């Protein structure tokens, strides 16, 4: 690095009002992105906490009624403390950096009602989508800033790093000194880009410091991925501005490449994966569920008799208990069995799409960074799919606990209820999808080095 050129460029930047405004804009937007994501996550977490509190309050009341019945304290109706009325909450807890990478959290269900009354499709608690325009363009979080806005800021700072001197004929006078044009461009870009990179890292470190339960590996992964991504863009800008004789020509090329990497390739990749691995028909899933529910309701007596023949040790309990409980439980079981093939198709289709996107992401460093960061934050499709799968298994376990009591019109004991684990414990013990960042980082750094090396080789020749 040529210190004279470097500090001279810093002095020029200090005297440039446009550059100062651009850097101030970068500072404000970068910190705003962290604040915006944190504010959204706080509101989301408050909503989930309130939901959990409401469901747990109902569960406590149900347990209190069951305890009173076991202790013979007062009379109870046939509807009181029935196992079909058990309600337990299940919420999707994301990673420590989810406030900087909202990902799929805005549009995927994050809270479920776990109850024998529900099946895999009806356990999703009602929730409200955000403003459609917000969902269309994406919420302002740090991932949006660093993947979409930061490259534009790098382009705005560096597109005329040498073109204006060439147009005014000043480059020849500058090159009369013992320096090459490539050296001039490199030092000027280092001076201009270093301040922006410092701002980005400052906002990133701020976002990491406000995270709860952040591990060193996650923090190091974020910093390394962001630096590798910015290094790629610096290499690309270095190549374009070195070959552009006019600033407008270089700017148009860089903006076109930004559109290609940030918008066109990600959209095309999603279209390709959707075409290759289409989702099964949701109408078919709903139709199968309705048919199964209808058939199970009609055959309640037959299904109950078949169950009792398989379990002769059980006897029918309180005759005052309405058959609706038994019918609902049996219909949910039939729905689960009849829709299992198409639900499996949904899961396999999602897995195939994600596996294909893991390959197609290497067409665009922007996609690489986005997918890597939201995967670390556990706000990606794989994490949400695992959440729904874990909740479905949790519901099946509860159904196994209450099945005998429901079908024989009896209650479960308080001890049996207390042995049911809460969903948070199960989710914490669940193995999360592994995230590999070595290949993404190595690929982006390799691209940056190739672009810089190609530019230097051309300048020497």
PLM regions with names:
Residues 1-135, 251, 258-461:
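Transmembrane alpha-helical segments and their membrane-interface loop/helix boundaries
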Residues 18, 180, 215, 219, ...:
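Membrane-helix interface segments
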Residues 154-158, 202, 235-236, 252, ...:
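Hydrophobic/aromatic residues in alpha-helical transmembrane segments
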Residues 30-40, 58, 133-134, 141, ...:
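Secretory targeting signals
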Residues 138-164, 168, 445-447, 451:
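Long, hydrophobic alpha-helical segments
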Residues 159-163, 207, 211, 237, ...:
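Membrane-water interface at transmembrane helix exits
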Residues 4-6, 156-197, 458-461:
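Helix-loop-helix units of permease transmembrane domains in multi-pass membrane transporters
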Residues 19-20, 152, 184, 249-251:
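Alpha-helical transmembrane segments and their helix-entry boundary regions
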């Amino acid at each position: 690095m040529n210190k004279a050129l470097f500090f001279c460029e810093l002095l020029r930047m200090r005297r440039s009002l446009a550059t100062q405004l651009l850097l101030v804009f970068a500072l404000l937007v970068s910190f705003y992105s962290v604040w915006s994501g944190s504010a959204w996550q706080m509101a989301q977490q408050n909503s989930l906490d309130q939901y959990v509190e409401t469901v747990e309050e109902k569960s406590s009341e149900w347990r209190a009624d069951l305890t009173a019945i076991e202790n013979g304290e007062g009379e109870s109706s046939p509807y009181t403390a029935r196992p079909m009325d058990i309600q337990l909450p299940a919420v999707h807890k994301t990673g420590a950096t989810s406030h900087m990478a909202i990902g799929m959290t805005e549009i995927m269900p994050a809270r479920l009602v776990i109850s024998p009354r529900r099946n895999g499709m009806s356990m999703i608690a009602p929730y409200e989508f955000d403003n459609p325009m917000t969902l269309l363009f994406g919420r302002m979080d740090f991932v949006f800033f660093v993947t979409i806005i930061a490259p534009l800021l790098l382009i705005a700072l560096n597109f005329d790093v040498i073109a204006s001197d060439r147009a005014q004929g000043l480059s020849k006078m500058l090159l009369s000194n013992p320096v090459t044009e490539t050296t001039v461009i490199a030092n000027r870009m280092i001076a201009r880009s270093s301040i922006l990179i410092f701002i980005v890292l400052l906002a990133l470190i701020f976002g990491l410091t406000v995270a709860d339960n952040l591990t060193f590996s996650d923090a190091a992964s974020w910093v390394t991925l962001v630096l590798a991504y910015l290094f790629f863009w610096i290499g690309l800008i270095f190549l374009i501005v070195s070959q552009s004789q006019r600033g407008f020509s270089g700017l148009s090329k860089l903006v076109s490449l930004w559109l290609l990497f940030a918008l066109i390739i990600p959209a095309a990749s999603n279209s390709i994966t959707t075409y290759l691995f289409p989702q099964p028909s949701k109408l078919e899933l709903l139709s199968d569920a309705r048919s199964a529910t209808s058939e199970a309701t009609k055959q309640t007596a037959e299904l109950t008799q078949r169950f009792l023949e398989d379990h002769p040790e059980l006897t029918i309990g309180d005759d005052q208990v309405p058959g609706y409980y038994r019918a609902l439980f049996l219909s949910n079981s039939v729905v689960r069995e009849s829709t299992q093939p198409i639900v499996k198709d949904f899961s396999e289709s999602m897995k195939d799409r994600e596996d294909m996107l893991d390959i197609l992401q290497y067409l665009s460093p922007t996609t690489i960074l986005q997918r890597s960061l939201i995967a670390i934050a556990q706000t990606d499709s794989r994490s949400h799919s695992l959440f729904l799968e874990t909740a479905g298994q949790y519901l099946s376990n509860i159904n196994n606990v209450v099945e005998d009591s429901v079908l024989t019109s009896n209650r479960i004991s308080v001890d049996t209820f207390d042995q049911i684990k809460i969903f948070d414990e199960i989710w914490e013990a669940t193995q999360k999808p592994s995230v590999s960042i070595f290949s993404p980082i190595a690929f982006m750094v390799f691209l940056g080095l190739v672009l810089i090396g190609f530019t230097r080789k051309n300048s020497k020749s």
